[in-house]
């Protein structure tokens, strides 16, 4: 018999994404969000869910754009800092020593040191409740060449992304267990 855990947002794992925006004055800001994912393949889209109280929320509404910078595990402390400190009062880039880079496609910055970047224009804003879902159409994905495989796709073992868990901890991604759309054919 399974135990009822109640109606809660305790999905076992979510990606750790760093959302990049500019404020009204053009100051670059980043915020870590663990509520995000892919939501459409045509047009290619991702979503991030943010509370209205965040500085990033207002920046996205104002600028209609954001980036997703995917940190590797060696940047876990910086990614956590980006999520626990407001950009209203501090310059997160200055404090962490990381570098804001201007996107050439959207009105938002990304983190130069992070190996994978997704550049998005806001396609739709969905008010749900405490959180608002920002759906961003992907304009481009940029990656450092050292995290790509032979097919020119991100290699998760080279990328070393961070995942967030329901018990409020960060984790590394483990080894692959099989090829998608293939291992099921063995049944």
Label for each model-derived stretch:
Residues 1-187:
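Basic, polyanion-binding surface patches
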């Amino acid at each position: 018999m399974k135990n009822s855990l109640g109606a809660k947002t305790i999905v076992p794992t979510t990606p750790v994404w760093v959302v990049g925006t500019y404020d009204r004055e053009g100051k670059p800001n980043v915020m870590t969000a663990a509520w995000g994912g892919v939501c459409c393949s045509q047009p290619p889209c991702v979503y991030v869910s943010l509370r209205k109280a965040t500085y990033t929320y207002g920046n996205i509404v104002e600028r209609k754009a954001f980036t997703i910078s995917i940190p590797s595990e060696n940047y876990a402390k910086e990614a956590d800092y980006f999520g626990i400190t407001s950009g209203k009062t501090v310059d997160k880039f200055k404090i962490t020593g990381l570098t804001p880079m201007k996107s050439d496609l959207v009105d938002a910055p990304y983190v130069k040191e992070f190996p994978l970047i997704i550049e998005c224009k806001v396609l739709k804003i969905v008010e749900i409740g405490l959180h608002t879902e920002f759906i961003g159409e992907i304009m481009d994905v940029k990656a450092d060449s050292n995290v790509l495989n032979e097919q020119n796709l991100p290699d998760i073992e080279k990328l070393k992304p961070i995942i967030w868990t329901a018990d409020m901890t960060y984790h590394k991604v483990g080894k692959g267990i099989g090829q998608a759309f293939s291992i099921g054919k063995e049944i």
